[in-house]
Swiss-Prot record:
InterPro entries referenced in this protein's UniProt entry, alphabetically: ATP-synt_VA_C, ATPase_a/bsu_AS, ATPase_F1/V1/A1_a/bsu_N, ATPase_F1/V1/A1_a/bsu_nucl-bd, ATPase_V1-cplx_bsu, P-loop_NTPase, V-ATPase_su_B/beta
PANTHER family found in the cross-reference section: V-TYPE PROTON ATPASE SUBUNIT B, V-TYPE PROTON ATPASE SUBUNIT B1-RELATED
Keyword Ion transport set for record: yes
Protein name: V-type proton ATPase subunit B 1
Native source organism of the sequence: Gossypium hirsutum (Upland cotton)
A matching Pfam family: ATP-synt_VA_C
Stated family: Belongs to the ATPase alpha/beta chains family.
HAMAP family linked: ATP_synth_B_arch
Keywords (A to Z) from UniProt: Hydrogen ion transport, Ion transport, Transport
Length: 488
């Protein structure tokens, strides 16, 4: 027992600095407690060598005098207080980044698992990211086209936005995420006509996909889907499986976002980051908190979970003078379909809206089962309109929302009073409700609609009503779009 000084000494600035200790005093879940440690630093990386010669990595979570609490990324099984030695490196956790990471698959710790060659890093970056001066942030604008009508028309996503998918167990959030990855692209304006087309610079768009706590079937689904549709070359995949160490889920989204920041701000790419499942991340956070015997907050989650989630979500955005952007779509499953659960509740406070996946629509065989009424994109106004999508976009979206909400009310009233008691106007709203769910919401998994097709489809439904009932659309827009053929 005791400590043995490493021959490399304590020379500042080198990776081999630090001391080797054999002073493990306890193990609690994913944590190792060390005694008699000289000068440990918060978030310092340690190398742990077990008695059988295997090595693991850990990170200092807490320092109290000569005591240090270390979270071990690969799990604590096999660690004892007799043969285990711990070396402090003096470095924070950094990940190698390179443009060559596109098209590759990594585990939750950032190590390649696709049998490809090692990554030749162009830089090593701190996984906590660099702090961004708020005054240097650029307001998110310009739309990312997902090819899904309910998102593009009614919940448009701006480049640099963070907007989560609120889902639940058994709902097709993985299929929707894969469809967004397949179809997502940039849009640009043609100077002469003012129209928008899909951006031809496909090499300027990239996707970073991080899966946390997923089962092998889900991991294989995403790998197979990316490879079969040819989008793998612009995707970087990080996979933390359900049987991987829970603690690894704490660093997986941070490694993914560090990679995204390099691709966006150093390589000039517009990066879409998809994180699934943030509920697994929150559970890992709760497990670490319980092991540290912290005072629990709501439902056992730590009181600092809001702050911790913000350190992930707030890494989306755009920076003045940098060409690229980071757009985040975190996916989380609400336990028992409860939107008041701490994870979706706190996520909703931080992010700029949400896309709500509805079980009732799913039970009626509607795909994608996106319920537009509780869904919201707070930055939609800056991503649409003349010069960005089309001048009628905002008006059409508002009118669709209004008519769908009224249609839902009429449907509820019909269940009470019967169809005979409804007015002719009420019947129009019922017809709209049915066609909206069958034609606009319903869409094939491989059915891509650009924003013009989606808007024209919306107009075909709005023409069910006489112009006088379309109160949300100004007369000038009516004159231009109401009477024209849907095909134009």
């Amino acid at each position: 027992m005791g400590m043995a000084e490493n021959t490399n000494g304590m020379e500042e600035g080198t990776l081999e600095i630090g001391m080797e200790y054999r002073t493990v005093s306890g193990v609690a879940g994913p944590l190792v407690i060390l005694d008699k440690v000289k000068g440990p630093k918060y978030q310092e990386i340690v190398n742990i060598r077990l008695g059988d010669g295997t090595t693991r990595r850990g990170q200092v979570l807490e320092v109290d005098g000569e005591k240090a609490v270390v979270q071990v990324f690969e799990g604590t099984s096999g660690i004892d207080n007799k043969y285990t030695t711990v070396q402090f490196t003096g470095e924070v956790l950094k990940t190698p980044v390179s443009l060559d990471m596109l098209g590759r698959i990594f585990n939750g710790s950032g190590k390649p698992i696709d049998n490809g060659p090692p990554i030749l890093p162009e830089a090593y970056l701190d996984i906590s990211g660099s702090s961004i001066n708020p005054s240097e942030r650029t307001y998110p604008e310009e739309m990312i086209q997902t090819g899904i009508s309910t998102i593009d028309v009614m919940n448009s996503i701006a480049r640099g936005q963070k907007i989560p998918l609120f889902s639940a167990a058994g709902l097709p959030h993985n299929e929707i995420a894969a469809q967004i990855c397949r179809q997502a692209g940039l849009v640009k304006r043609l100077e002469k006509t003012g129209d928008l087309l899909e951006d031809g610079e496909e090499d300027n768009f990239a996707i970073v996909f991080a899966a946390m706590g997923v089962n092998m079937e889900t991991a294989q689904f995403f790998k197979r889907d990316f490879e079969e549709n040819g989008s793998m070359e612009r995707v970087t995949l990080f996979l933390n499986l359900a049987n991987d160490p829970t603690i690894e889920r704490i660093i997986t989204p941070r490694i993914a976002l560090t990679t995204a920041e390099y691709l966006a701000y150093e390589c000039g790419k517009h990066v879409l980051v998809i994180l699934t499942d943030m509920s697994s991340y929150a559970d890992a956070l709760r497990e670490v908190s319980a092991a540290r015997e912290e005072v629990p907050g709501r439902r056992g989650y730590p009181g600092y979970m809001y702050t911790d989630l913000a350190t992930i979500y707030e890494r989306a955005g755009r920076i003045e003078g940098r060409k690229g952007s980071i757009t985040q779509i975190p996916i989380l499953t609400m336990p028992n379909d409860d939107i008041t659960h701490p994870t979706p509740d706190l996520t909703g406070y931080i992010t700029e809206g949400q896309i709500y996946i509805d079980r009732q629509l799913h039970n009626r065989q509607i795909y994608p089962p996106i319920n537009v009424l509780p869904s919201l994109s707070r930055l939609m106004k800056s991503a649409i309109g003349e010069g960005m999508t089309r001048r009628d976009h905002a008006d059409v979206s508002n009118q669709l929302y209004a008519n769908y909400a009224i249609g839902k009310d009429v449907q509820a009233m019909k269940a009470v009073v019967g169809e005979e008691a409804l007015s002719s106007e009420d019947l129009l709203y019922l017809e709209f409700l049915d066609k909206f769910e069958r034609k606009v919401v319903t869409q094939g998994a491989y059915d891509t609609r650009n924003i013009f097709q989606s808007l024209d489809l919306a107009w075909t439904l709005l023409r069910i009503f006489p112009r006088e009932l379309l109160h949300r659309i100004p007369a000038k827009t009516h004159d231009q779009y109401y009477s024209r053929d849907a095909g134009n």
